């Protein structure tokens, strides 16, 4: 006698390989939507941040300690788009990892390294803005290009060293050998991190973020006081030098506001992922795959948001984009073009 009920067909990532992961693909319509959304975010992260780097490095008027930090931050976000988002897009939509175990480790290493690099960049930018707002007279001597270069070096060397040491020595899953063995399959890229290392990761994210929030709270209070002072004195201004100082003060306040929005966007984007992996490590890795992917892509999309924030708040960036896209940037004298409306 034959049964009228057939067993559901199990799809595998690699049909002809023993120990292959199970594939749980989306419907064709959902796949198109997801690929479109993720491709847009990836391309924006790559080309948007490429525009930021080109603008700062090409136009001499933008050669300042703060802008060099912004360009370096854009480089970290650019690398997220190139080395992380494009491959994560395939993993998310296809529910399989087709790029090999070695590249899975490299992918995870880059993911963590560039995240912490962004945190440190933003933290140093906060310190820079705090100095320029609280002590503008000595800012030029305190936060020089050399100091900015040291901050940039630290923002790259520490995260790359930490991430490489964790993932390439295997200490991330010490004590979780049974769980790793149970979850291990061909076509998967799920990095397991022990509770101790997850807690360290959380603190590495939380402490600099807390410092940034405290600094920007002070910055905005001071900027508000300066705004009141400017409104009071602007009507009494007679000399062109005083008028120039007021314009510069307004520009610095706007820069502080823009970078504050950047920090807020970073915290909102990365907090769900950071909290999720912290809870997951102490609850037995029970987070559903779709929740984990939502948290991941919320964090990834932060790399695409910064160029949009700059375009929205910085007139000089919009002007630089026009010059780059029009080809005027190729002219011999383009690097000396004035980008500020003064």
Curated annotation (Swiss-Prot):
Residue intervals annotated with topology Extracellular: 1-31, 89-111, 168-195, 280
Keywords (alphabetical) are:
Cell membrane, Disulfide bond, G-protein coupled receptor, Glycoprotein, Membrane, Receptor, Transducer, Transmembrane, Transmembrane helix
Membrane topology, as annotated: Multi-pass membrane protein
Transferase as UniProt keyword: no
Q: In which tissues is it expressed?
A: Expressed in kidney and amygdala. Not expressed in other tissues or brain regions tested.
The record's listing under PANTHER family reads:
HISTAMINE RECEPTOR-RELATED G-PROTEIN COUPLED RECEPTOR, TRACE AMINE-ASSOCIATED RECEPTOR 8
Q: What is this protein called?
A: Trace amine-associated receptor 8
